[in-house]
Amino acid sequence: MAHELGAQEKITYGRNDRFEGGPVGGGRFWLDEQGRPVAKIGGPPDWQPEVMIDVRIGDTFAVGGQTWRITDIVDAESPKAYLLAVRVG
């Protein structure tokens, strides 16, 4: 699915097939040594050899020619953890 600039997507554990060129999915959420939330997300085959990447609030990732910025990681130590990403490019 193509997204407009400014569109927001929620990424939880498992697959999210709403990303053009995806899927993108959450693999793990936790707090780092400084108490900041971190997420490990998996992406499409063109992310090889890094199938999974660690992201923090403010980081960006690209999928399907679209660039996304992580705006929040919620309840990182909960089974209901998720992150929010906004399309910026």
Predicted regions: what they are:
Residues 1-89:
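Surface-exposed, beta-sheet-biased, low-hydrophobicity segments with strongly acidic/polar composition
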